[in-house]
């Protein structure tokens, strides 16, 4: 599991900053998909969907890196 930090650029409003926990990220067409593997159903589950043209992934960190960073604060 990884934490993807993203910024969604918006023309007429303030940009959105989000964090998405997912196993992997895919670019499909005009979208960025964030997916997690659902072991119960043995298939990927969509946990986030953002427009590729207006989204910037600013960082990616593993669960272990996140826990270590949060433990030092």
What residues fall within each predicted segment?
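A short, sequence-level motif marking secondary-structure junctions
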Residues: 21-27, 51-56
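A short beta-strand micro-motif
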Residues: 2-13
